Amino acid sequence: MRGGGIVFFKSRISAVDPAVARIIDGEVSRQRKHLQLIASENFASAAVLEAQGSVFTNKYAEGYPGKRYYCGCEYADQIERLAIERVCKLFGCSYANVQPHSGSQANQAVFLALLNPGDTVLGFSLASGGHLTHGASVNLSGKWFNAVHYNVRRDNFEIDMDEVRDLAKKHSPRMIIAGASAYSKYIDFKSFREIADEVGAYLLGDVAHYAGLIAAGEYPSPFPYVDVMTSTTHKTLRGPRGAIVLTNSEELIRKINSAIFPGLQGGPQMHAIAARAVAFGEALTTEFKEYIRSVIRNAKTLANVLRERGFDVLSGGTDTHIVMIDLRKLNLKGNVSALKLESAGIICNKNAIPFDEEKPFVTSGLRFGSPAETTRGMRELEFAHIGGLIADLLEEKISTDNAAEMVLDLTSKFNFYNV
């Protein structure tokens, strides 16, 4: 081990720790050679990665710009203020906190800021496409609060707004959550606002999956309808891992800031905030808007190909980057199907579908997403090919080995991270 000096500051991972270097190289190779179709994943730019690995890694900056508990925070203040300015411009809001380490912590901060333990929360059922932090029984949000859940309609698998209203009137929730992790259609934030007003509830919009689409103007904005919006900064925003909390209320941002620090977190990860600032700047460009339009076109192409091949695509298609398929008609399970696709280099995830009778680690569905491979440069032609490969594999019309060769041939044409 090197104690310090010039060598310490110049040594590369490959020289200092070959074991870690080999693992990183292996992951780079995996990302290059496989098709990354997990809806919550994306590829960050080289600029984002550079900021994430910057010397801000070294800096402790407990508190907020202009009010820190440590000295030497001049540049930490500058980068955090820049991130806040950019994200507020991106989503058309007045206030932002860019410090949450994850989407789950962002949601937890809103709970801490606005609720008391035992308060009633109305959220989207995990089984219908919601998220763990929307009141799932295994999550803190379901353990500390009285969680009630709305579902999708059985006829079209879209959010049942009649049920939302009925449950809100019956249970008088302190907060209603509008958001999802496995839902491919538009969310009607205006109707959620009307229901929240009827029962005097806060409205939280958790748009972690849709944030990039919203920023590009290709998905309904939660503002001005929600009281608070949360989102991760990776996924469709194409930034580093982390999260944001946004609002137009000065009163609420004070409560949220206190909930995040000192309520939940200590020092913010300034290197991650620097990377978020870069990602927000990228998302403000016209190039990002065109990228998001391609993301949606590619997802629609994938959904159309799978539907034409006889697969049951939930909701009949997609408005977003997410494509969900129901495998029950083919007598297939999500876990087995996901592993089969992975063996050919197609990476997706097993996913429960609405009213699924299978266990969470089995499931009856698969979830696909288009953001990562769109970032890589693939367009509708490639996604049509990918859809055909998925169908051929699941219908056993092609061997895994042959499919793997075709995947490798495709991915080799779209190389990246050439470092």
From Swiss-Prot:
It holds the Pfam family SHMT. Its cofactor is pyridoxal 5'-phosphate. GO terms for molecular function: glycine hydroxymethyltransferase activity; pyridoxal phosphate binding. Pathway: One-carbon metabolism; tetrahydrofolate interconversion; Amino-acid biosynthesis; glycine biosynthesis; glycine from L-serine: step 1/1. (6S)-5,6,7,8-tetrahydrofolate binds at residues 126, 130-132, 251. Keywords: Amino-acid biosynthesis, Cytoplasm, One-carbon metabolism, Pyridoxal phosphate, Transferase. Its EC number is 2.1.2.1. Its main location: cytoplasm. SUPFAM superfamilies: PLP-dependent transferases. It catalyses: (6R)-5,10-methylene-5,6,7,8-tetrahydrofolate + glycine + H2O = (6S)-5,6,7,8-tetrahydrofolate + L-serine. It is found in: Cytoplasm. One of its GO terms (cellular component) is cytosol. One of its GO terms (biological process) is tetrahydrofolate interconversion. It is an enzyme of class 2 (transferase). The keyword Oxidoreductase does not apply. InterPro entries: PyrdxlP-dep_Trfase, PyrdxlP-dep_Trfase_major, PyrdxlP-dep_Trfase_small, Ser_HO-MeTrfase, Ser_HO-MeTrfase-like, Ser_HO-MeTrfase_PLP_BS, SHMT-like_dom. The keyword Calcium does not apply. The record marks 234 as: Plays an important role in substrate specificity. The modification N6-(pyridoxal phosphate)lysine is found at residue 235. Homodimer. Belongs to the SHMT family. NCBIfam families: PRK00011.1 (NF000586). Catalyzes the reversible interconversion of serine and glycine with tetrahydrofolate (THF) serving as the one-carbon carrier. This reaction serves as the major source of one-carbon groups required for the biosynthesis of purines, thymidylate, methionine, and other important biomolecules. Also exhibits THF-independent aldolase activity toward beta-hydroxyamino acids, producing glycine and aldehydes, via a retro-aldol mechanism. This is Serine hydroxymethyltransferase. The lineage of its organism: Bacteria, Pseudomonadati, Pseudomonadota, Alphaproteobacteria, Rickettsiales.
